[in-house]
Amino acid sequence: MRWLGLGAVLLVVGCGPTPAAEYGEELFGDSKLSESQYNTFSCATCHSTAATPPQGKVYAGLSLHNVASRPHWWGGYETNLLDAVNFCYTAFMRGVTPLTPDDPKSRALYEYLVSISPDAQAPAQPFTLVKDITDVPRGSAEWGADVYRAACQDCHGEAHTGKGRPSKLAPILPEVAADYGVAFPGVAPGLVFIEKVRHGRFFGVGGNMPLYAREALSDKDLGALLAYFEL
Ligand code: HEC
Ligand code: HEC
């Protein structure tokens, strides 16, 4: 528990859901937590809170069950929980000003995260970033269609049409790759696609899409997705 300046809040831990935790749960599912009018993501877009991985759904982020009981976050890059949250808030949710410890919204969110952390201590979760992009073997296109629905469709809408996507800022897949040959001459479009999925907006790639670590999406699932998209 390393949310600096929140000592007083710790006193309520273990007393069941508090009104603040309930407000925090609302904020967790609310894209309006971010002040940016272009943001359509809430914490719940990318994180489950379940103790066991949900079936039929692939989240970019880890489950936040027991998150407040972990010793560090982001594979050890973050040693303060608020910083770990602010990473998502600014990088993905287009938040301009990071959440501060004494902001009532941060406090409520923190209490909610504590309320979904029943164990006093929990192990840090592995987070394996794929830094060097290499091609992956293509898998089953049928499987790839399932991967698309489970991992990408919430934000990108239906494949080939984008139907149902919450924001047009997320391009239609795989059609967006049609320009890759011109934009990235000499690089196979499949590789550009893999880089986007593995790096999100990092390592020179722009945007606000989350990255997928190996734990979130295996190379096998990625290969199936590429087969489905004939990339
Ligand atoms: C667009 C997707 C996205 C959104 C929105 C998002 N996150 Fe994340 N978050 C990630 C990814 C990807 C990671 C890195 C993988 C991981 O550790 O879960 C991450 C990591 C984290 C971690 C570190 C977990 C650990 O143990 O390493 C915390 C804590 C966290 N997010 C909390 C939040 C909270 C709270 C919100 C809402 C304010 C939020 N995130 C919004 C994608 C997102
Ligand atoms: C949380 C929402 C979200 C999820 C989930 C998501 N994306 Fe995205 N994606 C976006 C947004 C927003 C953009 C446009 C901004 C950007 O490029 O980051 C984007 C852009 C892209 C691009 C285009 C990059 C370009 O400009 O050429 C590709 C390719 C892509 N996503 C693939 C995927 C795949 C494959 C998945 C599933 C494994 C996925 N995305 C899941 C939100 C998401």
Predicted segments — roles?
Residues 1-32, 78, 83-86, 92-108, ...:
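N-terminal export/targeting leaders of redox proteins
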Residues 15-37, 117-147, 163-164:
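Electrostatic cytochrome c docking/interface patches
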Residues 19, 54-98, 109, 170-231:
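Extracytoplasmic electron-transfer domains, predominantly the class I c-type cytochrome c fold
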Residues 29-63, 119, 145-183, 198-207, ...:
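Periplasmic/extracellular electron-transfer cofactor-ligation site
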Residues 35-41, 96, 126-128, 206-209, ...:
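Short helix/loop segment immediately N-terminal to the Walker
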Residues 52-53, 92-98, 116-125, 135-137, ...:
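Inter-heme linker and motif-flanking segments adjacent to c-type heme-binding CXXCH motifs
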Residues 102-113, 128-143, 213-218:
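Amphipathic alpha-helical surface "interface" segments used
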